[in-house]
Amino acid sequence: MKKYLFAAWLSVTMTTVHAQEPNIPRGMFGAPQVDVKFDEYKAAPQGFDQEREGIATGTVKLIEYQSESVGTIRKANVYLPPKYDASKKYSVLYLLHGIGGDEWEWVRDGGVPNIIMDNLYADGKVADMIVVMPNGRAQKDDSRAGGMGSFRAFGDFDKDLIGSLIPYIEKTFSVYADKDHRAIAGLSMGGGQSLNFGLGHMDVFAYVGGFSSAPNTQRAAQLIPDVDKVKKENKLLWMVCGGADGLMNNSAQLKAFCDENGIPCTLINYPEGQHNFVVWKYGLYSFAQLIFK
């Protein structure tokens, strides 16, 4: 019963704090309780998330795929980089939204992933990749309405992601089809999903990122039952959370566990950052530069 009461509380609360203006405070749930040593914060340059004139730009394409686990046609947005060339291979970043979002949250609600990626490409700071922004709510009614059913559907999304979406992407676009060329990251609820799925399926994803990860994040001992396996198979475990965000503890407990067990793990404390796209844009900007290299 407690699990379902928590699910209801989280669903209502997080749905309320999402779907608002992109830069206002969201998700304030109390102070962090775990003491950790944060990694160095390096500020993004001014204008990293602003359109620039005179550079090549990518495109965002809405795709539809048949979901075997959900039993319906589902949608995702795909960012194709400037001068996408079907004759060459690309890596793939799966970028997840929060509990109040959908496949459009990153694109329309303030994340500007296409602009961030275009600028990184122009500066030669990222490896060749496409970015897939799915709907992480694995149920037939996958609208932003939320509710307890949606909370459960977020937990089931790995079946749809791994069983249907990834095969569709690898059949439709010119991408590599191995774990070393797949990364997963997300914001808030999507950050929790990314940590759960990325560490739970290390045969599928080599790079894992969590931006202000929500309370759906499993406890560290559940995420990492085999320390040696993570050390061997994971290439990057990277997190960021705002210093003024009460959800910091979700990331801090994982960072503390990793430090205690000698697992490479990064946790950035974004100065005075809150639960919004100011932090999440920084997360994408930073994480994208570290993967597939």
Where are these regions (language model features)?
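Bacterial N-terminal signal peptides
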Residues: A7-T13
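Positively charged n-region of N-terminal signal peptides that target proteins for export
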Residues: M1-Y4
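Sec/Tat signal peptide C-region and signal peptidase I cleavage site
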Residues: T15-A19
